[in-house]
């Protein structure tokens, strides 16, 4: 990680494969929290390149726990960082209530007071990775919820670091791009 950080400190960019490997290593616990926080901070100080974002996304998709609910529309838009009302979760219930099946993918709020998982948990939703249970939920209620850490190990690995930083990071862009249910 030291060489990677020096490269980034010199205003160089990561290649797609390099970014992919880095996120895989983060998920596998090969870097400590300080190193990961340093890496995240670099991308707070400069824009992430398309190659870097694609590499990180590739890693998330390769490591995800796939869910075959592909006949339904996945929704995940990421937080706005403004501590506003969690509109996307409310919209999912509105859409489901109108008879349109929805798969919501989300997490606890890292940069706001209420992520989708916070809202769902407060309403008694028990998070699961059991696809059969999700299918039953779709059949009965037109909605299924995918708690991101159950389906993306890398997101689980960085959750405490993101919570500690308490600012929007490139993971806010990655989550919606790496929904376990691909359209």
Question: What spans do the regions from the language model cover?
Answer:
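A glycine-rich phosphate/pyrophosphate-binding beta-strand-loop-alpha-helix module
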Residues: 40, 85-141
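Acidic, glycine/proline-rich low-complexity segments that act as flexible tails and inter-domain linkers
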Residues: 1-84, 94-98, 102
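Conserved active-site and cofactor/substrate-binding residues in soluble primary-metabolism enzymes
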Residues: 13-21, 30-38, 48-55, 86, ...
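Structural motif
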Residues: 75, 105-107, 146-148
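Gly/Ser/Thr-rich beta-alpha loop segments that engage phosphate groups in nucleotides
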Residues: 80-83, 117, 177
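Phosphate/diphosphate-binding glycine-rich loops and adjacent basic-rich segments that engage nucleotide
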Residues: 133-183
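Residue-level signal for pocket-adjacent positions within structured domains
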Residues: 3, 9, 115, 172, ...
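Short glycine-rich loop/turn motifs that provide flexible caps or phosphate-binding loops at active sites
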Residues: 10, 28, 77-78, 108, ...
